[in-house]
């Protein structure tokens, strides 16, 4: 399953829940990558860009098959799921899958970072010394405002 930013969305949980519970999947592997475009903009700015186009993010159906499912007012920037740090996002994604009640506890869940700069796959880390020297964070893309927390 691939999505923007490798963020755990309701659709990712839905897909993982189905395959793990009914089709015998025993392992979930999360692979995120450096130089991700989801680091390159601020969620609030994206929300404003939609408003400037005449689109009201507070009044859109998230899923065309469930038009009654809408975000709470003001939650669009959080829902977009922009990120500040690939490693931190990967670690939180692993934790979210491991702790989700619809994912069986015996499913192995791991996460990895593909370093575009070094062409190396490594485990996510909070230690900046173990990251690629050229890896960027959202601040290095020029994003000055911290992203709204996806996990709270």
Task: Kindly label every feature range from the protein language model.
Residues 1-15:
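Conserved beta-strand-loop surface patch within small alpha/beta domains used
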């Amino acid at each position: 399953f691939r999505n923007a930013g490798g963020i755990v969305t309701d659709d990712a949980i839905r897909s993982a829940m189905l395959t793990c519970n009914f089709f015998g999947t025993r392992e979930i592997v999360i692979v995120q990558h450096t130089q991700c475009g989801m680091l390159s903009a601020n969620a609030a700015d994206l929300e404003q860009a939609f408003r400037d186009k005449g689109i009201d993010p507070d009044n859109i159906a998230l899923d065309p098959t469930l038009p009654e499912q809408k975000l709470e007012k003001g939650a669009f920037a959080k829902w977009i799921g922009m990120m500040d740090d690939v490693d931190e996002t990967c670690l939180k994604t692993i934790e979210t899958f491991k702790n989700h009640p619809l994912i069986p506890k015996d499913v192995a869940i791991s996460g990895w970072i593909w370093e575009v700069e070094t062409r190396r796959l490594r485990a996510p880390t909070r230690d900046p010394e173990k990251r690629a020297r050229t890896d960027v964070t959202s601040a290095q893309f020029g994003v000055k405002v911290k992203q709204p927390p996806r996990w709270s």
